[in-house]
């Protein structure tokens, strides 16, 4: 009695489409509009070749001394994303700092978290870099990003300038 061997085919699952492809890879009027709006900012056409769109969530603010240095640092982050083959997009979110917010920044932590979550969720972002530097801003950004469940990198750095009494 001969045994027949059944061929078992293992089908490879295709990698899921990136979130950003739901905006930029479309071949309809909406895809055209999304690409056109982005190209209006000077983004070249080759950025839409399927590379990951990486959001830079920036808490830069002149009202928050521990986040005031992120304006310049964001440019280096953008260059790094480009060198790694990504498409960087920077967006602002609420910045919290105890120095000027009254009565306390803690009252706004959850609001900042919601700002981050909805900004990431609503836009064509495949991963995000969080730029934060205060004890209220850092947890709020991390909480918001965790709610969206995308690859996330945190740059937490505070730079407070000192002065001398003359």
Predicted feature residues:
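Short, ordered loop/turn segments at secondary-structure junctions
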Residues: 59-61, 93-96, 133-136, 156-160
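A short, small-residue-rich loop immediately preceding and capping a beta-strand
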Residues: 120-141, 152-156
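Gly-rich Lys/Arg/Thr-decorated short loops/hinges at beta-loop-alpha junctions or inter-strand turns
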Residues: 15-24, 54-61, 91-103, 120
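Glycine-rich oxoanion-binding loops at beta->alpha junctions
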Residues: 33-42, 82, 87-130
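N-terminal amphipathic/basic leader segments beginning at the initiator methionine
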Residues: 2-51
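A glycine- and small-aliphatic-rich helix-loop capping segment at beta-alpha/alpha-beta transitions
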Residues: 72-76, 107, 111, 143-154
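Glycine-rich phosphate/diphosphate-binding loop of Rossmann-like nucleotide-binding domains
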Residues: 50, 54-55, 61-95
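Residue-level detector of conserved catalytic or cofactor/ligand-binding positions
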Residues: 160-166
